Amino acid sequence: MSAILSADDLNDFISPGVACIKPVTQPKSELNPQHVDSSSTISETGEVEIQIDSQGNPLEISQIDTKINKADPSSTALTPAQISLADCLACSGCITSAEEVLVAQHSHHELLKAMEESSLASGTEKVFVASISQQLRASLAMAYDMSIEEMDKLLINLFVNQMGFQYVVGTSLGRKLSLINESQGMIHRKEEGKTIGENLKNPVLSSICPGWVLYAEKTHPYVLPYISTVKSAQQITGCLLKNLTAYERGIGKSKVYHLTIMPCFDKKLESARPELFANHDGADNVPDVDCVLTARELVTLIDESLGKYQLVPKVIPQTLLRKDIAEVYKSAAPTNWPFVQYSWSNDPGSSSGGYAYTYLRLFQEQLITTQNYRPEDFSMKVLQGKNTDVYEMRLLHNGNQVASSAIVNGFRNIQNLVRKLKPGNNNNKVGGLAIKVNPLVARRRARMSKSEDSSGASASSMAPAEIADPSKVDYVEIMACPQGCINGGGQIAAPAPTSTPPAAPAPAHAATSTTDVKIAVVLNKDWVSEVLMKYNSVPMFDLSLHPEEIAGFIQWSQEFEKEFDVSEQRLFKTHFNEIEKPTDATAIMVGSKW
């Protein structure tokens, strides 16, 4: 693995597949022409041998020529096998993706290469634009010990004044449109279910995290019908930014290069997912995102530039810091970019976007508006799960539950959830879902029950506290990273712990490395908590408190769709497919199972 991302950074890690199962084929166009047109095309299907020439290049030697035609064997140069991000999306060989492919195809080297090629082009220069996530801003602000506002000014200065980007925007506009569509879809589902009497047993599962979605596609396809098809902020922002930039500059969308800075490496894979709802004429097949970098990769780019690019100059111009932040945001955005005042804002709820929280609050607002409920009659109840990465939120009206959602972070917790959603489990069914009871837990509960009976204590007074059960809620916000997106794999890690000399010589068998690991884990948890505080310092804009603005967002998006001939499905919807398991015996033998 690369120095940027390694398994040592992860505490909730599932090993990738041992072998890539994508078939290696030699395209016909790359074969020697004199054999492509032959009557038997035996060079394609006949007996061949691979040899290395004097230059170290691999050659395919046809043995059939010497056996049948008694001629000198023909040779064909072989090209290196290449794997694209699209291949990773359609391959079940790894749990999410091959990290080398992510770094190779969406790296700062590729960005710099594109910038150099554009500068050398004559009349075909590209316009470079960037979008920046809230988690990235918090990570960099923490790493450089700055406020969010100061970091935003420096980021815009880096991209616009040093790297020559035309526009820089926050991803908040895309996120708010994603939140609105996700919440409205949930509210419609809930109201429609009541109308037709449908028993909504299984929850809707979020699709914002590409790592979780790929895991479901490759290992648990039975949950795909439950996964929401609403796009993430990254993809919605990309569609908006490319169309608006192309229109303003009078160029085609293919001439706009969109870089987005995200907290997670798997966001690179999300950008490679093909569009299902693109226009049939092919004009809309331009990707919404051309390159995804993480905080770590951005810092690496700056370090390797040898002073050409500086995020934090040695002497920061005071004129830059004194600028009004609202004016800085406005000057960096396209002139036709809407809601500039909200485009760098944050949203209440989790550090992954607040999807679970926003759904409950917008549903509450819906009930107040349509059912004449009083706001003071609502309350929110939070139930903790078996660990801090699982919790449930219940919206109560006069003490009665009217809606619920949950947060599930980390692959261990995700595995527990999808097991409960697996059809056909009949052991100890509760609410239509199979729950396996640990025998040791059952015996312990039995002993506790006997103890309560003998002591005369009432069952109600000794009842255990409720534990969150995400399998029974309306909506689950799922993130592959423990602690959510604020702890994404591409975020700046905590500084390495400084070891102090021990008071006494340690025994020869002492496992000092284990101690260092424990210290690192504690430091990382504290570090992530500090980054979360930075994240929460981003000015909040609660959609549920501004229903009139929600109407404005919806109206603007509808006008955008008409003006740019972009369908609602193209702007807001994505798709998922079951990834078929390999049938090749070798791949099955060396592959991994999860």
UniProtKB/Swiss-Prot annotation:
Segments for region (Disordered): 444-465, 492-511
Family indicated by similarity: Belongs to the NARF family.
Protein residues bound to [4Fe-4S] cluster 2: C209, C264, C481, C485
GO BP field: iron-sulfur cluster assembly
Pfam family, one: Fe_hyd_lg_C
Molecular function per GO: 4 iron, 4 sulfur cluster binding; iron-sulfur cluster binding; metal ion binding
The protein, known as: Cytosolic Fe-S cluster assembly factor NAR1
InterPro entries to which the protein is assigned, alphabetical: Cytosolic_Fe-S_CAF, Fe_hydrogenase, Fe_hydrogenase_lsu_C
Gene3D superfamilies in the cross-refs: 3.30.70.20, 3.40.50.1780, Fe-only Hydrogenase (Larger Subunit), Chain L, domain 3 (3.40.950.10)
Keywords linked to the UniProt accession: 4Fe-4S, Iron, Iron-sulfur, Metal-binding
The species this protein was found in: Lodderomyces elongisporus (strain ATCC 11503 / CBS 2605 / JCM 1781 / NBRC 1676 / NRRL YB-4239) (Yeast)
Record carries keyword Iron: yes
Function: Component of the cytosolic Fe/S protein assembly machinery. Required for maturation of extramitochondrial Fe/S proteins. May play a role in the transfer of pre-assembled Fe/S clusters to target apoproteins.
Binding site for [4Fe-4S] cluster 1: C20, C88, C91, C94
Keyword Transferase: no
Biased composition (Low complexity): 454-465
